[in-house]
């Protein structure tokens, strides 16, 4: 598995980011013209998307934006930022046996309570496991941090996982760490204390917490290692 990559949709344009218009739309210079780029990741991405940063995007066939942001190119790494692919990545890790060996993906976006989780798994003994997947693109001093912007929805997901565990389900949260220099994962207490507290409570309630480090190359995603987790303030 260490030498296997998950193929990514290959971008067809390289550009220079100029500014963010709103949560999901930015402007980049591509091919000598200013183009609208769809940004699927709702986070701030402030350390990645700033005037002058180099981006990779693929052409869209429909919609108000002509391009879809795939990755940001830093001096020494590519950072994959297409959050729409997180479930696919987690499914690949599970089906490959790297994460939760012996489990298989039974369903995507299973309903639970008043909402949905990302994956429903079936374990080696027939047990059901609910999984929530989060992508991590913020790294500070070797520490991968989530979230990079306050997320009421993320905190609610942790609370729902804790309830699922209390109801007898096996429950997991998987953090996909997409930064090369990350050596440990932590919740971002400074940015979103509510989420950090909800994650810590979920862990104490029996929710399994995983952090998986991945590296982006042109154009595939490679599993690197499982990172230690520090939930302390």
From Swiss-Prot:
Signal sequence residues: none
GO molecular function, one term: DNA binding
Family of this protein: Belongs to the SfsA family.
Listed name of the protein: Sugar fermentation stimulation protein homolog
């Amino acid at each position: 598995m260490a030498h296997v990559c998950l193929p990514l949709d290959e971008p067809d344009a390289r550009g220079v980011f100029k500014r963010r218009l709103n949560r999901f739309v930015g402007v980049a210079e591509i091919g000598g013209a200013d183009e609208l780029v769809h940004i699927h990741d709702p986070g701030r991405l402030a350390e990645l998307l700033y005037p002058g940063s180099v981006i990779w995007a693929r052409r869209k066939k429909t919609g108000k934006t002509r391009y879809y942001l795939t990755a940001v190119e830093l001096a020494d790494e590519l950072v994959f930022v297409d959050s729409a692919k997180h479930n696919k990545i987690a499914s690949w890790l599970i089906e490959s046996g790297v994460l939760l060996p012996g489990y298989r993906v039974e369903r995507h976006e299973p309903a639970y309570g008043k909402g949905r989780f990302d994956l429903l798994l079936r374990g080696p003994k027939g047990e059901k496991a609910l999984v929530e997947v989060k992508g991590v693109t913020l790294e500070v001093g070797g520490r991968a941090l989530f979230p990079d912007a306050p997320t009421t929805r993320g905190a609610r997901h942790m609370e729902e996982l804790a309830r699922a565990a209390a109801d007898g389900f096996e429950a997991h949260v998987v953090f996909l760490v997409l930064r090369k220099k990350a050596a440990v994962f932590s919740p971002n207490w400074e940015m979103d204390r509510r989420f950090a507290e909800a994650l810590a409570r979920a862990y104490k309630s029996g929710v399994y917490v995983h952090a998986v480090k991945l590296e982006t190359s042109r154009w595939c995603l490679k599993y690197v290692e499982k990172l230690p987790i520090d939930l302390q303030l």
